[in-house]
Amino acid sequence: MLRTLRPALVLFAALTLLTGVAYPLAVTGLAQVLFPEQANGSLIERGGTVIGSALIAQAFTGEAYFHPRPSMAGTGYEANNSGASNLGPTNQGLVDQVAARITAAKEANPGNYGGVPADLVTASGSGLDPHISQAAARWQAARVAKARGLDLQRAVALVYEFTSPRQLGILGEPRVNVLAINLALDERFPLAH
């Protein structure tokens, strides 16, 4: 019986070492050499302190900042709670949430008479999407400009500066990283305290 089990046990041990040890170490090593920033989480540092990741949304509130998409990942965009609400488009709970977010967005951005961009009132699949559409950023630009004492054209120019194009020219939509644009606002146009 041991003679018949031996090949299976050897194959099991070999595949465990190959796929459980060698392959992960090789991929991690290659990632560290070829893409060190991305392999370490695309962390953003200021003054030697990590303040966030370009891949994870952060909660920004107040008139002087661009706001990210709503998150279903807890109140603070908690990565360990990542996930969608799992509410279908006809679920009354989702309809009520979106209606409340539309009202709040219109109150926070007076003077915007067009429709609220969908990504400002709907959560992403992960609940942690760090990007908003260019339209969502432009929609908030007047509020941010007023709160910071900027000309609207400067705020809109900043939106265009921080707009990333479609991936490979065809995938997705142009998007704005909320953390990156808000950090630029604080560096270039600091708030008077």
Swiss-Prot record:
Protein topology in the membrane: Single-pass membrane protein
A GO CC annotation given for this chain: plasma membrane
Keywords, in A-Z order: ATP-binding, Cell inner membrane, Cell membrane, Ion transport, Membrane, Nucleotide-binding, Potassium, Potassium transport, Transmembrane, Transmembrane helix, Transport
Main location class: membrane
Subcellular compartments: Cell inner membrane
Keyword RNA-binding attached: no
Database matches in InterPro entries: KdpC
Pfam families tied to this protein: KdpC
Domain of life: Bacteria
Transmembrane segments: 7-27
GO molecular function: ATP binding; P-type potassium transmembrane transporter activity
UniProt function note: Part of the high-affinity ATP-driven potassium transport (or Kdp) system, which catalyzes the hydrolysis of ATP coupled with the electrogenic transport of potassium into the cytoplasm. This subunit acts as a catalytic chaperone that increases the ATP-binding affinity of the ATP-hydrolyzing subunit KdpB by the formation of a transient KdpB/KdpC/ATP ternary complex.
Family indicated by similarity: Belongs to the KdpC family.
Description of how the protein assembles with itself and partners: The system is composed of three essential subunits: KdpA, KdpB and KdpC.
Matching NCBIfam families: kdpC, PRK00315.1
Listed name of the protein: Potassium-transporting ATPase KdpC subunit
Organism per entry: Rhodospirillum rubrum (strain ATCC 11170 / ATH 1.1.1 / DSM 467 / LMG 4362 / NCIMB 8255 / S1)
